[in-house]
Amino acid sequence: MASKITAAQVKELRDKTQVGMMDAKKALVASEGDMDKAIDFLREKGIAKAKKKSGNVAANGLARVKEDGNTAAIIEVNSETDFVATNDTFNALVDTIADTIAEKQPADLDAALALTTADGSTINDAIVKTTQVTSENVQLRRFAVVKKTDGQVFGSYLHQGGQIAAVVVLDGADEATAKDVAMHVAAINPEFVSRDDIPAERLDHEREVLKQEALNEGKPEKIVEKMVEGRLHKFLSEISLADQPFVKDGDQTVSQFVASKGGKLVTFVRYEVGEGIEKPVADLAKEVQDQING
């Protein structure tokens, strides 16, 4: 005869696992009221659900920066909808992942997923649990571990609560300056620290395109070279952080601003949630219904 499942048992299992009421009840029925077996059942069900959800497009989510001494971690964790991105459980997961990666500095994504968090579970286990709670595909998409020396400083900035994250390293400047540069990086999205970091083949290609563009405009060849250099300077100011007009003072470049504070640009990393992912057309009514249905 099947064991009768009480409301108290359902509440206890929900408190321990954060799953929905119906999932908790099903697990207790399947395990005949045995709490440990019910938890195992939910873990197995969560893994199955995570695998099922892994085919869904996860293009929302949050980016985060965590500093730990001379190490900083910048991460992006994705969800399917922005509903989940504002969920407390999802936010706690993002914080846990950022803390763990900053502390343990894994070499790649597989190593990161296998890391043990403060509560003894792995990052992968934590992701599976969050998938179980939210009924969405949740993924650690990418991360970077950034290092500095004792004489250098980090600056970090989150835009719109974590839709864009940036971390920079400056040499010889203070943290306030570094934060201003991080804000600039988040807003303007440079590709390289300086023109010296731009591959020669890309510069050569751009120079040739600009030359042909000027010739096609019918410009005399004797002034084409001067025009190309002027347009190339504009191109550099669009992709090189050092050459970009500083977002808080357009009369000076970022490198000039940093130099005025006694510093030098070292490196930066910028993540924008969902960049490069083809997003499905939003259907608000369906998103709401999916949340209701769990």
Curated annotation (Swiss-Prot):
Family, according to the entry, reads as follows:
Belongs to the EF-Ts family.
CDD domains membership: UBA_EF-Ts
Q: Which parts of this chain are annotated as the region Involved in Mg(2+) ion dislocation from EF-Tu?
A: 81-84
GO cellular component terms given for this protein? cytoplasm
Record's subcellular location: Cytoplasm
A Pfam family: EF_TS
According to its UniProt entry, the function of this protein is described as: Associates with the EF-Tu.GDP complex and induces the exchange of GDP to GTP. It remains bound to the aminoacyl-tRNA.EF-Tu.GTP complex up to the GTP hydrolysis stage on the ribosome.
Which domain of life, per UniProt? Bacteria
PROSITE patterns, sorted: EF_TS_1 (PS01126)
InterPro entries, per the entry: EF-Ts_dimer_sf (IPR036402), Transl_elong_EFTs/EF1B (IPR001816), Transl_elong_EFTs/EF1B_dimer (IPR014039), Transl_elong_Ts_CS (IPR018101), UBA-like_sf (IPR009060)
Principal cellular location given in the protein's record? cytoplasm
Native organism is Levilactobacillus brevis (strain ATCC 367 / BCRC 12310 / CIP 105137 / JCM 1170 / LMG 11437 / NCIMB 947 / NCTC 947)
Alphabetic keyword roster? Cytoplasm, Elongation factor, Protein biosynthesis
Q: Output this protein's name.
A: Elongation factor Ts
Q: Name one GO molecular function term.
A: translation elongation factor activity
Identify the coding gene: tsf
